[in-house]
């Protein structure tokens, strides 16, 4: 449902109208939005990932789950391909590596904050400003081509 709401805000058909960096920033902001408004979704995803990685599930058992990710995966790949055309962010590293170093890092940070698994955290504290700073570092990395 959450991804469907995002689809309404930024339809996949609009990929050619929006610079890749703006799509990327939208994705980063979406994770922060999940932290603010849908912490349970981030927590569920974390618990699900833990379960899947430790329960000994086979690939066939995860087919429905993998199918549900198709829309998001397609969006990220189209965003990356668009960046190759408009040069609004780095594409000098392979797509899979780019995703791990950027999108997955942001998702992991938001998940850890949602779970309260951060050093020195106060319960019920709002850490949006810190997540925005992390987002800023990631965006600077993808724009500046710095390691």
For every predicted segment, state its role.
Residues 24, 62-65, 69, 99, ...:
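Hydrophobic packing residues in well-ordered alpha-helices of helical domains and bundles
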Residues 30-34, 74, 78-86, 100-147:
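C-terminal peripheral helix-coil segments that are non-catalytic and often amphipathic
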Residues 33-75, 96-97:
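Short secondary-structure transition hinges
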Residues 6-7, 76:
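N-terminal alpha-helical segment
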Residues 11-41, 95-102, 131:
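Hydrophobic alpha-helical connector segments
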Residues 1-5:
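Short, basic, alpha-helical segments at the C-terminal edge of helix-turn-helix-like DNA-binding modules
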Residues 13-14, 49-56, 113-117:
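Secondary-structure edge/capping motif, primarily at the C-terminal ends of alpha-helices
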